[in-house]
Amino acid sequence: MVHGQVNATREGVEANLPVAVMSTIESGAPLAHVPSIVSQNEKHDIESPLDEKQDPALAYSESRTSGAVPHGELAIVNDGSPFPVDPNLPEETSQLTWRAVIIGSLLGLIVGASNIYLGLKTGFTFGAGLFGAIFGFAIIKPLSHVLPEKLGGGYFGPKENAVVQTAATSAGSLTGLFVAAVPAMYHLGLMKTPKEDIGRLFTLTIITAFYGLFFAIPLRKYYILKQRLVFPSPTATAFTIRSLHDTTTPAARIAAAKKIKILAVSFVGSLTFKTVSQYAPGILWDWHIFWWLYTWGWKGIIHAESWGWFIELTPAFFGAGMLSGLNASWSFMLGSILAWGVIGPVLVKQGKAFGIAQSEEIPGWIAYTSMSSKDYINRPSPRYWLLWPGVFLMVCYSFAEIAFSAPIFWSAIKSGYRDTRYKLREAQARRKGQEFNEPKPEGYEAMEDPAPPHEQVPLWAWVAGLLLSMVATLVVGHFQFHLDAGVGIVSLLLAFIFAFIGVQSSGTTDVNPIGVIAKASQLVIGGITKAQGIPLHEAQLANLVAGSVAGQAASHAVDMTGDLKTGHLLRASPVAMFWSQIAGSFIGIWLSVGLFVLFATAYPCLTNLEIECTSFGMPAVSAWRSVTIAVTAPTLPIPHSSGMCAIALGIAAAATVVVKHLWIPQKYHKWIPNWNGIGLGFVVPQTYYPIAMIVGAHVAYSWESRRPQSAEIWVFALAAGLIAGEGMGGVLSALLTIVKVSGDIYGSPVACPGWEYCG
């Protein structure tokens, strides 16, 4: 059993949008909810007998959250050091096993598939760590008892479980390219077709995966060993793994079994519901309440339907709300209300934006959420007009937050320089056989690695890998994407900078801002290509390729560093984690490209801008495409009124950060709206996602307030299963579309607007 306290409570981090378990390509904001690691730090040595009428699993959970530690068990206060060795567990002689890598990578496939589906819909992606940890335990633990060792049997402990979850994360976190920059390349006519470009897609994924992976090793040294950053979600994963393997009491075993059962049932239920609902979407999936009221005689209410206000019974975003909390969900909702309930209608009323009539027979039924427009400057659609304020305010908000962390980054740079100089001088003295008496830099002792030397990643392994991946990036960029070597080097430098920012932010607040600040790379690359005077299409391709390299490589480095934190706490071998990350990333490259080709085959609109995409909103794609056009065009293709609004909201967002940090006490930060969430509401036209999220957030809040012990067991497992299940349901739906047995062929239009199929 584990017990601990993390320096980030639900209230303290709730103001961030969903990342570690859930992240957004556009908001870059992660998951704030880490339910199983926040508890009292008092240590008690008392016996706590179970009431015969009480659920043993809840009693176990209550002992975790109340501070009571049953006799003979370990109490842990998380100070960044590895958990103490549990004398009740056997020694793990083998951590890097084929079963851990294969099972972990397959679980990463599930999350990767979910990320492709959900990312194309909203720009959201989800981390695979906790999902891989729990499901990996559920699969391997029973097999370890019944199979011979040669076939995957043998003891399965927490260290190997850490290897499973890092393989899952490595394999499942490479889909960001395919829900943002890559579709944007096709929309701009810069690529041919996914099947024809499959080699280029593979190499682009490879260079973004391995550069970030190798760079995570030195980041571990500084941020995990020396700074001892909290990393809330990876720490939650470590505590979860330890609790799953706690077999000292019947209550602990029952609690672990309940989490597994909840996760499995919610996953299967969500997958089934998503797949079946496409055959009657107007009844089972989308409730177009305002359309129903219109057909019953309330003619004026058709305008609400035109602006996309209806309810979708989406398990994934109900689960996302459970994980994100009230602040993140309501900030998203506030942005949607402002954009699609206030500003948008005012724009249309004043003739600043224009929609497309849906039907001549139904006056007032107009599509306002489409990106299509014949003249983006003089006759923009509301969605195009609102895109720029949304993107700009998120960028301003994120950089304002980073600015307040500038002293920390400067301290990190100085400390890294001092430590490196000390190491080089020490090595030089040893080579010459001289005595080295120079005093160690302040805090240098904290860099001592608790892992034995044979479990540490050799210097040659990550340095050689880093250099090879850098060379590969330049070679692939030049020969396959006509990328200038100077632009390629700049993209690698930006990835380096973004990785530092992302790990620092993720390690302290669980917020990874890379999705937003990657827009800065597009601005930098756009300036370089303009100065070079290269043709427009080459400039656009360079912008998207270099921007995706900087963003995806840095994002992967942040994910890998978080996994190394989980392994550090569990005393897992860093070199075993390292090779698992390489294997998982290698498998993930094939899976990510294959999944994108599958979806592009089923839904041609993903790569053809002329086809209206009713199944996917693609907000991240729209943002990357629009920014690319803007930074490479001779004049900015932004309506003047949209630009003014963007500047005003950007100033307001930055000012909020200043006021929050300088004058508002920390305990009140949870009441301050999250501007990343507000901006997301501008970028994502689907208002039913924040509606589902606030319902999920309120359910989780009420549950945790009234029955915290039950919530600790149920909330995350239920939410994770709902999210992954709908994502896999989306993959199954894509397969059904390809074989022509999907809902758009055999489904019913009952209760859909205009009596046309709405699935």
Regions found by a protein language model. Give the residues of each.
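Alpha-helical multipass membrane-protein architecture
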Residues: 2-7, 12, 18-759
